[in-house]
Amino acid sequence: MATIYKVLIPLPSVDFDPSETSIPWKILKENGYEVFFATPNGKPGSADFRMLTGKGLGIWKPILIAHKKARTAYNEMISDPNFQNPISYKNLKAENFAGLILPGGHAPGMKEYLESEELQKFVGSFFATGKPVGAICHGVVLAARSKLPGTDRSILYGKKTTALLKSQEMAAWNLTRLWLGNYYRTYPQSVEEEVRSALKDPNDFHFGPKPIFRDNHKKLKWGHAITDGNYVSSRWPGDAHSFTVSFMKLLSNR
């Protein structure tokens, strides 16, 4: 009987990015993986409504909203029994999963996930097992804040990584700040700046090709994913397909 690998996707209660969660979920499910979710309180989470509806994005809605296929995948995902019955952070055990995906999101509700000491401790212990870990966009901030057990060093120290680029973050903020304020600025420090500060060498941060087009299953080269050992990272929703394919390669090599 073939082994069914279990992959965990932790989430905040609200405001996670729908594309960076639902696209990996859908691709993993289609390839025979079982996907579980975790939230702070064990109750189902909900994605950033602006990314789903485009409300408040003004004239930039067509380029900033989650793409239609991602929104469709999200609606499928939230009907999944595992999504409706998430595990609470406090009950997570690394031995129960073969892989871990850390999605992103930029709205204020993400801070609950990014700043959770309980979740950071779990991520650190999971990384130490050598099992596959994937982080995309702000999910790389969670990885950067997580420490290897018994050390004061980030799990990313000595690793090559990418994350949301400062140029991307500032562009989205500048397009919308007149009416949305700091919606696109989760923290005063950019994702790129915080992640680079956690690395052994700031040059271990990889920018990749200019992020113009969103990738898809036929255009994986439009995306960007960096793999270093058991760890794979990507920058934004436009990398989600290539990110997940790279993550699955790590799972299949175990």
Regions found by a protein language model. Name each.
Residues 137:
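Catalytic, metal-anchored helix/loop core of enzyme active sites in primary metabolism
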Residues 1-129, 142-254:
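Extended, subdomain-level signal for the structured scaffold at the beginning of enzyme domains
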Residues 132-133:
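Glycine- and acidic-residue-rich phosphate-binding/metal-coordinating active-site segment common to enzymes
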